[in-house]
């Protein structure tokens, strides 16, 4: 089964998550981690912490190890991650990618912030006149600028590995793990 989870709930009830994983045979944990930076999580009004994100990853990593030791199919983490939010700085982006690299069997789904109308942050960006979007360009994986004030060249360089030393590992290798949800089900 595919389990859609919140990091704070995994961190709060690890024994329940462990039992549900074993009983329901969860093989994919879809977790909206969003960021490895507390500052960015707060900007998003995510109401979770970086520590809860790490605890969720660590628990699923333990479940992976257990399943492998027992000869069962190990679960994967399908992690939703967002970069390019208002106020994000390079170190915040590096922290998000470092967090993603902690996942033993992770499929990072990395997208750039899109200021969707109706969302609190999207409404604020639009009200501040920073949105470059029209409804025709509201896609999950944008290939063009969505917001004024974001250094999209930085993110392109980051994804190409030009900041690997600062991040501490090969970012293109992490990006190669990126996939779609259907891959987590096979």
Residue ranges and their predicted role:
Residues 2-185:
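A structural motif corresponding to the C-terminal lobe/cap of the Radical SAM core domain
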């Amino acid at each position: 089964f595919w389990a859609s989870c919140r990091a704070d709930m995994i961190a709060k009830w690890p024994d329940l998550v462990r039992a549900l994983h074993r009983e329901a045979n969860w093989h994919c944990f879809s977790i909206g981690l969003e960021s490895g930076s507390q500052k960015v999580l707060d900007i998003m009004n995510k109401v979770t912490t970086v520590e809860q994100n790490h605890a969720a990853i660590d628990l699923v990593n333990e479940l992976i190890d257990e399943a492998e030791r027992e000869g069962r199919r190990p679960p994967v983490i399908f992690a939703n991650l967002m970069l390019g939010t208002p106020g994000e700085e390079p170190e915040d982006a590096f922290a998000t990618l470092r967090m993603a690299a902690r996942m033993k069997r992770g499929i990072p789904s990395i997208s750039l912030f899109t200021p969707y109308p109706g969302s609190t942050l999207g409404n604020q960006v639009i009200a501040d006149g920073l949105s470059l979007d029209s409804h025709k360009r509201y896609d999950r994986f944008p290939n063009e600028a969505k917001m004024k004030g974001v250094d999209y060249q930085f993110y392109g360089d980051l994804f190409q590995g030009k900041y690997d030393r600062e991040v501490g590992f090969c970012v293109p290798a992490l990006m190669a793990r990126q996939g779609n949800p259907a891959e987590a089900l096979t």
